[in-house]
């Protein structure tokens, strides 16, 4: 069972309740705070499940449905459209954080986290994870971890217990390298990736990449 790490983080006991009120005690198979994904397991057979869709194929303007348990209103479904892909919010403060959210206007509130975002075919395209709101309740913007990221994380957690990922060992300038940004950074290059910092003894450092390089 896929959910968000922040849903089960620091929990002493986790119970999964089905729509028919059947309850199962869940075991944590693994967590990945950098993507806010967690994998649980319950001892049960024949449970219904969703098929993964390829989240890379999701199109802007596509209709989606968000399923969840907002404010303990079980089996709530809301509809919206995809308005952005690969959205970064800066909500995950981990140095290894990976944010590439699908943005939608489907209503998501506290209690929706870890729920499914599905396409019109009922296929999983994301895991509802966050909202952007001054009040803590839905104000028009919600965000989901794409299914392709969730699928990779879940596969690694099942096989290895942790997520396997490579690390280049560099920090990149987040803004697009325009002439104005290039002038601010003191470089003549106006395209590419500006290396803001290099981690000592990392893969990039060993390859000769230095702070201030443009790749």
Regions found by a protein language model. Give the residues of each.
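Conserved catalytic motifs of ABC-family nucleotide-binding domains
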Residues: 212-215
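Serine-dependent protease modules
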Residues: 1-191, 196-201, 206-207
């Amino acid at each position: 069972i896929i959910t968000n790490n922040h849903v089960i983080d620091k929990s002493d006991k986790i119970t999964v309740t089905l729509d028919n009120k059947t309850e199962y005690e869940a075991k944590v198979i693994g967590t990945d705070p950098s993507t806010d994904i967690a994998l649980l397991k319950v001892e049960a057979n024949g449970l219904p499940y969703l098929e993964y869709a390829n989240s890379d194929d999701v199109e802007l303007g596509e209709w989606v449905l968000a399923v969840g348990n907002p404010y303990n209103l079980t089996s709530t479904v809301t509809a919206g459209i995809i308005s952005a892909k690969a959205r970064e919010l800066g909500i995950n403060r981990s140095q290894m954080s990976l944010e590439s959210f699908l943005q939608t206007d489907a209503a998501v509130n506290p209690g929706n986290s870890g729920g499914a975002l599905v396409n019109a075919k009922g296929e999983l395209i994301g895991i509802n994870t966050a909202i952007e709101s001054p009040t803590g309740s839905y104000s028009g913007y919600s965000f989901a971890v794409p299914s392709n990221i969730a699928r990779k994380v879940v596969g690694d957690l099942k096989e290895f217990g942790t997520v396997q990922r490579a690390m280049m060992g560099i920090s990149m300038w987040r803004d697009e390298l325009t002439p104005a940004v290039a002038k601010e950074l003191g470089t003549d290059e106006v395209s590419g990736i500006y290396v803001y910092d290099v981690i000592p003894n990392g893969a990039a450092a060993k390859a000769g990449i230095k702070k201030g390089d443009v790749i």
